[in-house]
């Protein structure tokens, strides 16, 4: 299975993404044929800082589970308005 096919499962999910020139927590917005659109989160304020388009061949690591990801999801969820 190719990396891009696997990443399509994680569209709209929070992950830790490491690529050739950086590593950040964020949300995968879209997985294209040869790139990934990634919203970077400022972990201090839990707000989206910027959107990055990353060439898929430069992606080295994607972490989609664990304590850090759970913490980010919990903090983002706590900031949602009450229904």
Tell where the protein language model's regions lie, with residue ranges.
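Conserved RNA-binding domains used in RNP assembly and mRNA/RNA metabolism
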Residues: 1-83
